């Protein structure tokens, strides 16, 4: 699942960059910029859907990766497991900042 995580992360970064090129965060124009992305940008609706659904698939892959680590007893490798827990917390904080706060 590590390779799927890498693929999901690369897809999220690319689609996020493409969406950020057309998005404005001003309170009066934010909704119209999303409408602009979906209607006027070539395949903007597809980029937006890939970005939204890719985030869900990314977390599914993370949970499967953690489940595999639990099944095979990888938690016995303390340093590696703790780094993974820190990475999971960072990913969850980033998702909160990117989804809830805007």
Swiss-Prot record:
Cofactor note: Binds 2 heme b groups non-covalently.
Binding site for heme b b562: 51
InterPro entries tied to this protein: Cyt_b/b6_N, Cytb/b6-like_sf, Di-haem_cyt_TM
Gene Ontology CC: mitochondrial inner membrane
Keywords attached to this entry: Electron transport, Heme, Iron, Membrane, Metal-binding, Mitochondrion, Mitochondrion inner membrane, Respiratory chain, Transmembrane, Transmembrane helix, Transport, Ubiquinone
Cofactor(s) in the UniProt record: heme b
Chain sites annotated for binding heme b b566: 65
Membrane disposition: Multi-pass membrane protein
Transmembrane segments: 1-21, 45-66, 81-101
Cellular location(s): Mitochondrion inner membrane
UniProt-recorded Gene Ontology molecular function terms: metal ion binding; ubiquinol-cytochrome-c reductase activity
Protein's GO biological process: mitochondrial electron transport, ubiquinol to cytochrome c
Pfam families the record matches: Cytochrome_B (PF00033)
Keyword Transmembrane: yes
Keyword Amino-acid biosynthesis: no
Protein task: Component of the ubiquinol-cytochrome c reductase complex (complex III or cytochrome b-c1 complex) that is part of the mitochondrial respiratory chain. The b-c1 complex mediates electron transfer from ubiquinol to cytochrome c. Contributes to the generation of a proton gradient across the mitochondrial membrane that is then used for ATP synthesis.
Other facts noted in the record for this chain: Heme 1 (or BL or b562) is low-potential and absorbs at about 562 nm, and heme 2 (or BH or b566) is high-potential and absorbs at about 566 nm.
Entry's family note: Belongs to the cytochrome b family.
Subunit and partners: The cytochrome bc1 complex contains 3 respiratory subunits (MT-CYB, CYC1 and UQCRFS1), 2 core proteins (UQCRC1 and UQCRC2) and probably 6 low-molecular weight proteins.
Protein name (database record): Cytochrome b
Lineage, uppermost ranks: Eukaryota, Metazoa, Chordata, Craniata, Vertebrata
Gene for this chain: mt-cyb
